[in-house]
């Protein structure tokens, strides 16, 4: 599961650094206690705990607390919540696609003007309010051909849809 690009991206964002992914892999492999995970991954115990709590805060891991009858210390048994990872990815992908489609619609429906010095990009209505003069430097605004930007957004949409489709095929299999 961790090899999927969407899963890896989500988990890397949560654990802050790709070098902490072995902690997640240990959880997936069924290692339960923070001490055992630290031992298996050779990552400091305080870092393991920090990452486990981050996963917990995102709902990607849960724990059960039990008391050792001999030492009277609490032991935390952790479990990776695969379904929550799936839910996060579905939700994040849908949200990102909505944002991209909204951005695409805006770019396709709007005429833009830019400052030749790179100070500002304004839609037609706002540019008319400034008489097509840059409010920062006084240069005359130029028409901005956003064809390449529209193409890039469409490519991004295709990529997200393709990655999401590939992910759901793996999950549903």
UniProtKB/Swiss-Prot annotation:
The HTH TFE/IIEalpha-type domain sits at 3-86
Q: Which InterPro entries match?
A: TF_E_archaea, TFE, TFIIE/TFIIEa_HTH, TFIIE_asu, TFIIEa/SarR/Rpc3_HTH_dom, WH-like_DNA-bd_sf, WH_DNA-bd_sf
- Subunit and interaction comment: Monomer. Interaction with RNA polymerase subunits RpoF and RpoE is necessary for Tfe stimulatory transcription activity. Able to interact with Tbp and RNA polymerase in the absence of DNA promoter. Interacts both with the preinitiation and elongation complexes.
The entry assigns this protein to a family as follows: Belongs to the TFE family.
- Quote the function comment for this protein: Transcription factor that plays a role in the activation of archaeal genes transcribed by RNA polymerase. Facilitates transcription initiation by enhancing TATA-box recognition by TATA-box-binding protein (Tbp), and transcription factor B (Tfb) and RNA polymerase recruitment. Not absolutely required for transcription in vitro, but particularly important in cases where Tbp or Tfb function is not optimal. It dynamically alters the nucleic acid-binding properties of RNA polymerases by stabilizing the initiation complex and destabilizing elongation complexes.
What is the name listed in the Swiss-Prot or TrEMBL entry for this protein? Transcription factor E
NCBIfam families recorded for this chain? Answer: PRK06266.1, transcription factor E
Q: Which UniProt keywords apply?
A: DNA-binding, Transcription, Transcription regulation
Instruction: Supply the gene name.
Output: tfe
Q: A biological process (GO) annotation for this entry? A: regulation of DNA-templated transcription
